[in-house]
Amino acid sequence: MAIDVRPGKYDDFVSALSKHIAIIRTESGCEFIDIYRDTENENVVNVWEIWSDRPSWDAHMVNENSKAWQSVAKDFVFGETITVMDSLS
């Protein structure tokens, strides 16, 4: 996921996102999640996630933690792009 962060909000956003990700790591089906700084745009954060299966990811996207995060993120984010991929190996 590529997240467009409002200018001047990057550090605060990453701090809040790090706390959110610590919770996600405990969710059933989450095999990996981490944050990456975009090297070409200082206001873009990329989140890489690996889930054991699609139902786990779907459940994550609508759970209470994710709903709470959306209310926090709106103060920092003005756009995001989610790309869902399937492993080929």
Where are these regions (language model features)?
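An amphipathic, aromatic/His-enriched active-site/gating alpha helix that lines ligand/cofactor pockets
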Residues: 23-31, 50-84
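Short, surface-exposed ligand-recognition loops at beta-strand->loop->(often short) alpha-helix junctions
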Residues: 4-13
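Short hydrophobic/aromatic patches at helix-to-coil boundaries
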Residues: 85-89
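Short alpha-helix boundary/capping motifs
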Residues: 14-15, 63
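Short, well-ordered beta-strand segments in beta-rich or mixed alpha/beta enzyme
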Residues: 1-4, 34-61
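Short amphipathic alpha-helical/adjacent loop interface patches that line ligand
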Residues: 17, 21
